[in-house]
């Protein structure tokens, strides 16, 4: 991949990205690692060419198959929550690969990233993009995200990019002691949840309900 493609041109320029990062700061995002990685990650590469000029708007955008690339603010917010609430993050599970953009941020922050996607064409395209960006610390699974990836757990952090009606028990079981789950929960009305597994009583989970959000629904099964 050429430097020109990575840097972007016109609406994907560094100045455009810098304006987005300033908006995120204005909205309360403070983690400098998250902001720096978002500044330097080419979000336009995770969209079809027709939408690439809108990549640095603070809005969700369609990626096909009824899915979306999440609003940059909520991506930054959830990533910041994951980093801030957990201890040392060595291994993270992402539920919902989608475009691969959130995956790319996690892979620059965490040594091991495991990502599960139910829609095969989306994951294939995401894998190709992430490979082009040189990110090699990611493992992929095509499966129902509600079951997580138990064979590879336990995880220091789990981040879900879709909203179930209730938190799946399987995801809670795959958290390591002290592990953190960041997940939107609900139907028409959704709330962002931060759930931490107790380090001593591992049957105990502490839940914080943070703010209203809007995500695509958490669906069961797989699609090809």
Swiss-Prot record:
Name the enzyme group at the top EC level: transferase
Active-site residues annotated for this sequence: 70
GO molecular function terms noted in the UniProt entry: protein-L-isoaspartate (D-aspartate) O-methyltransferase activity
Is-annotated flag, keyword Transcription?
no
Catalytic activity, per the record?
[protein]-L-isoaspartate + S-adenosyl-L-methionine = [protein]-L-isoaspartate alpha-methyl ester + S-adenosyl-L-homocysteine
Enzyme Commission (EC) number? 2.1.1.77
Q: Looking at the Swiss-Prot or TrEMBL record, what is one Pfam family this protein matches?
A: PCMT
- List, in alphabetical order, the GO biological process terms annotated in this UniProt record: methylation; protein modification process; protein repair
Q: Which UniProt keywords apply?
A: Cytoplasm, Methyltransferase, S-adenosyl-L-methionine, Transferase
Tell me a GO cellular component: cytoplasm
Q: Where in the cell is it found?
A: Cytoplasm
Q: Which family does it belong to?
A: Belongs to the methyltransferase superfamily. L-isoaspartyl/D-aspartyl protein methyltransferase family.
Listed HAMAP family: PIMT (MF_00090)
Q: What does this protein do?
A: Catalyzes the methyl esterification of L-isoaspartyl residues in peptides and proteins that result from spontaneous decomposition of normal L-aspartyl and L-asparaginyl residues. It plays a role in the repair and/or degradation of damaged proteins.
* Protein name as it appears in the record: Protein-L-isoaspartate O-methyltransferase
- Give the species this sequence originates from: Cellvibrio japonicus (strain Ueda107)
